[in-house]
């Protein structure tokens, strides 16, 4: 992504290693020298966090770090979380003011979702509307394990969109891509 000053960045990582950010050379597409793996933003001890994406929103002057938490399968509760910063390389704070660098599993833990559950503002997760009486032949309606998103800000219209994949009730692990408009609340947090 490009920051407000036109500098190119790459955010990457998942699960065991955590989420990192590197400043890139826009001419070569390679990382700028001397950064190693980059600056760590969050994650430790096999935390199920992946799919980082950063969007700068000029109306709020924040950088939004989108992440997918939890297991990927339909039953595993995959969901999208968000944190924000005034600078591209953080620190990123959630809506409770928690620094995301503290988000991660306990030492020696392995995929303990409860260790990371309190971090990041939850933007979307699984939901379901069951059939009403008289609609017994209709499947439940809803999303299962939405996540692994990207986002875009349209400069011409001033609108923001989130692009993600999701599964559906009664369809197993089959998934599709969805696009939804995002809106900013009065505190500058995205809503879908």
Please state what every model-predicted region is.
Residues 1-192:
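Carbohydrate-active catalytic/glycan-binding domains of CAZyme proteins
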């Amino acid at each position: 992504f490009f920051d407000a000053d036109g500098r190119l960045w790459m955010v990457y990582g998942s699960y065991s290693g955590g989420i990192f950010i590197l400043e890139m050379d826009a001419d070569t597409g390679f990382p700028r020298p001397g950064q190693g793996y980059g600056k760590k933003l969050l994650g430790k001890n096999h935390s199920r966090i992946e799919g980082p994406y950063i969007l700068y929103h000029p109306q709020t002057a924040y950088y939004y770090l989108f992440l997918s938490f939890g297991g990927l399968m339909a039953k595993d509760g995959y969901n999208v979380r968000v944190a924000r910063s005034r600078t591209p390389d953080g620190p990123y704070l959630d809506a409770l003011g928690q620094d995301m660098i503290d988000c991660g599993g306990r030492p020696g833990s392995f995929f303990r979702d409860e260790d990371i559950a309190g971090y990041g503002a939850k933007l979307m997760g699984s939901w379901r509307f069951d059939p009403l009486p008289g609609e017994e032949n209709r499947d439940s309606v809803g999303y299962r394990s939405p996540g692994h998103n990207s986002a875009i800000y349209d400069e011409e219209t001033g609108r923001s969109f989130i692009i993600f994949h999701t599964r559906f009730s009664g369809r197993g692990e089959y998934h599709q891509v969805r696009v939804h408009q995002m809106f900013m609340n009065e505190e500058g947090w995205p809503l879908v």
